[in-house]
Amino acid sequence: FFLDDCAQGEAVIGKCSDYMQFKEAETEMYPAFGNNEMRLDWMKKLSDAQIVLPRLIHATAYVSPTAEVGAGTVVLPLAIINTDCRIQSGCIINCGSIVDHGCVIEEGVHISPGTVIKAENRIPRATKIEAGEVVPLRAYPL
C-alpha cells in the first residue's frame, strides 16, 4: 500500500500528509518521489518522526561488499555499485546504471537508467544524471 496526493486505487490508503497515522514501532517508509528535493524534504520529515528509512536493493542489482549505501536509497534492477563507493541517503540508482569504483554519490542524487558514472567522481547533492549519460573519469573531482 502507499500514500499519494494524486493517484487513486485500492493500494492508495491516504494522502502523504497522513503518514503519522501509519507510524508503528516497526514501520518503515520510503519517500518515492522522483523530485530530488521533495524526496529529501520527506526523508527529513520521516526521520524527524523517528520512522525508519529502508535501503531498497533489488535482487538483481550488484553492490560491492566494500560499498556503502545510505538509508532511504533505492538500487533498482541490474544496477551495479562497485568497490569503495559511498552512496549517501535518499538516492535513486536506476535500472542498469553503473557506479564505478571510488565514487561518492551525495544525498538525493538520481542516477537515471543506463547511466555510467566512471571512477572517482563525487556527484553533488540532488543532481539528476540523465538516462544513458556517461560521466567521464573524475569529471566531478572528489
What are these model-derived regions, one by one?
Residues 1-33:
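A solvent-exposed beta-alpha-beta segment
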Residues 8, 37, 62-63:
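Short secondary-structure capping/turn micro-motifs that flank functional sites
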Residues 9, 26, 50-51, 132:
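A generic structural signal for alpha->beta connector loops
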Residues 12-13, 48, 72-74:
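Short, hinge-like loop/turn segments at secondary-structure boundaries
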Residues 20-24, 44-48, 66-67:
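Short, charge-rich binding segments
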Residues 31, 35, 39-57:
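Glycine/small-residue-rich loop that forms an oxyanion/phosphate-binding "nest" at active or ligand-binding sites
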Residues 56-142:
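Structural signal for interior beta-strand "rungs" in well-ordered beta-sheet cores
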